[in-house]
């Protein structure tokens, strides 16, 4: 938010679904200094009442003179903000740094356009692509700095997904721990075709209403009743050819829940299922300079491909060092930031 002299007097971002939008935060910070100024937004200000009031009403009420928009809102329900602002006599400039805006909002844009979440696969691996030793020892392959970056990724996603094998082996909490989104609890999704998740698992004992256990028709009635009594959300979805939860149906279901960004943390079979379904949009692999070898667990299993022509191709977008570890970020070529947006 710029005042009439071009000085920055406010800024904001949309921290959580259902919470105030970025414009509201920026205008609240600016107060009366916003009148007659310019507000710069990434997506077009919303024009419809949903979980929050329309942002265009807040902008009009604040006496803003000019609005600069990077990308139009593709949602036909929420769009129309530009037209509304112009009808009120406010100057609107569109398409400024639109490519940067698209990259910044590509997870949200995927959900708006396809009504499915953007899927990010995350793993900590050795140089030879292993996520555990042959005995199952996996804590810790990467160092503390890499693990902290992994926790940041949880803050950027609406839900965390693992398979029941990870629950049985590691009993993870699958929580946000950095406090970057206060009041916004991440959803926890467990793929468990036969409902083997035990009632004493942390994801069941702690905030069970935030846990979704997804199974197929193969689950026994007593296990359905057991988890229902524990208070978790349980949903049956179709099975694929391997009698596991069909990934396309899962993404449709999560999209209907409003989950726009899904972080898939494994294990190997779960990662394999998502790659087999060509459902992974983004990859974060944290690589430690070690060799495990032998029959240790690989990062991605599943069915795989028969030829290199069939391999899933991605674009290397960024790489960062975390002490001795290397963070590699890849996206689909069509979603890549090929121009280096800043």
Task: Pin down the residues of each PLM region.
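Generic structural signal for well-ordered alpha-helical scaffold segments
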Residues: 27-31, 60, 109, 151, ...
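Short alpha-helix boundary/capping motifs
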Residues: 30, 87-88, 112-114, 282-283, ...
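Proteins enriched for Cys/Gly/acidic motifs involved in redox and nucleic-acid/cofactor modification
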Residues: 82, 96-124
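Active-site beta-strand termini and strand-to-loop segments that position acidic
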Residues: 2-4, 113-114, 332-333
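Short capping loops/turns at secondary-structure boundaries
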Residues: 74, 78, 94-97, 112-116, ...
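Enzymes that bind and transform nitrogen-containing heteroaromatic metabolites
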Residues: 10, 51, 118-342
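Hydrophobic beta-strand positions
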Residues: 1-2, 124
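Zn2+-dependent cytidine deaminase-like catalytic core
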Residues: 2-100, 187, 212, 273-275
């Amino acid at each position: 938010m710029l005042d009439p002299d071009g000085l920055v007097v406010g800024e904001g971002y949309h921290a959580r679904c259902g919470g105030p939008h970025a414009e509201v935060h920026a205008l609240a910070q600016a107060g009366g200094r916003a009148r007659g100024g310019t507000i710069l937004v990434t997506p077009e200000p919303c024009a419809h009442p949903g979980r929050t009031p329309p942002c265009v009403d807040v902008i009009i009420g604040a006496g803003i003179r000019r609005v600069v928009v990077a990308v139009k809102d593709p949602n036909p329900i929420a769009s129309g903000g530009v037209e509304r602002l112009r009808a009120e006599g406010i100057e609107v400039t569109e398409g400024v740094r639109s490519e940067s805006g698209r990259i910044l909002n590509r997870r949200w844009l995927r959900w708006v356009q396809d009504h499915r979440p953007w899927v990010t696969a995350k793993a900590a691996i050795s140089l030879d692509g292993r996520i555990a030793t042959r005995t199952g020892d996996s804590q810790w392959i990467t160092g503390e700095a890499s693990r902290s970056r992994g926790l940041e990724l949880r803050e950027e996603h609406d839900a965390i997904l693992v398979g029941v094998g990870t629950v049985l082996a590691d009993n993870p909490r699958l929580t946000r721990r950095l406090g970057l989104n206060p009041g916004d609890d991440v959803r926890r999704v467990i793929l468990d075709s036969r409902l083997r998740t035990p009632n004493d698992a942390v994801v069941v004992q702690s905030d069970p209403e935030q846990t979704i256990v997804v199974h197929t028709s193969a689950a026994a009635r007593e296990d359905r009743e057991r988890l229902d009594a524990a208070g978790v959300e349980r949903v049956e979805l179709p099975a694929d050819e391997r009698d596991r939860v069909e990934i396309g149906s899962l993404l449709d279901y999560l999209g209907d829940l409003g989950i726009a960004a899904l972080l898939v943390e494994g294990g190997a079979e779960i990662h394999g299922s998502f790659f087999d379904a060509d459902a992974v949009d983004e990859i974060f692999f944290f690589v430690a300079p070690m060799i495990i070898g032998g029959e240790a667990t690989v990062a991605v299993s599943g069915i795989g491909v028969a030829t290199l022509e069939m391999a899933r191709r991605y674009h290397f977008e960024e790489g960062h060092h975390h002490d001795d570890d290397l963070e590699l970020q890849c996206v689909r070529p069509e979603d890549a930031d090929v121009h280096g947006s800043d």
